[in-house]
């Protein structure tokens, strides 16, 4: 029963992540003026990271009593990724973006690297969730 709940929780998280990355964020930047879109996304990301961390942590806690250590490790890694993104990566991305918008070319390059790292982390988390779902589906 706990593994099933963890499966559903993880599947919902993966679906939300894919929707956010492939649907919501691109839509914001194609439908809103650039400055408005940037401010809006900056306000949304802390919520996205908190919800992601909380959901992955819930999956981790649901799995703990099962002793399925590989699944527990994957769920915990996803939660950790969200916390890393929220408390380390996001402030650095925002600071680099702000300096870049003020004309600092080096900051623009730093922003591009940090943003790329953020996208890569999100992709790695999605792959970890796919792996977790496969493990849980196997029973």
Positions of PLM-derived features:
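Polytopic transmembrane helical bundles with strong interfacial aromatic enrichment
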Residues: 1-139
């Amino acid at each position: 029963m706990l593994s099933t709940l963890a499966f559903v929780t993880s599947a919902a998280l993966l679906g939300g992540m894919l929707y956010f990355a492939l649907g919501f964020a691109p839509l914001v930047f194609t439908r809103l003026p650039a400055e408005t879109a940037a401010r809006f996304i900056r306000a949304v990301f802390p919520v996205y990271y908190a919800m992601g961390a909380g959901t992955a942590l819930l999956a981790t806690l649901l799995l703990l009593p099962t002793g399925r250590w590989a699944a527990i490790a994957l769920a915990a890694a996803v939660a950790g990724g969200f916390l890393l993104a929220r408390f380390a990566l996001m402030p650095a991305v925002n600071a680099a973006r702000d300096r870049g918008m003020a004309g600092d070319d080096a900051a623009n390059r730093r922003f591009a690297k940090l943003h790329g790292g953020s996208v890569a982390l999100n992709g790695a988390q999605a792959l970890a969730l796919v792996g977790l779902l496969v493990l849980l589906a196997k029973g």
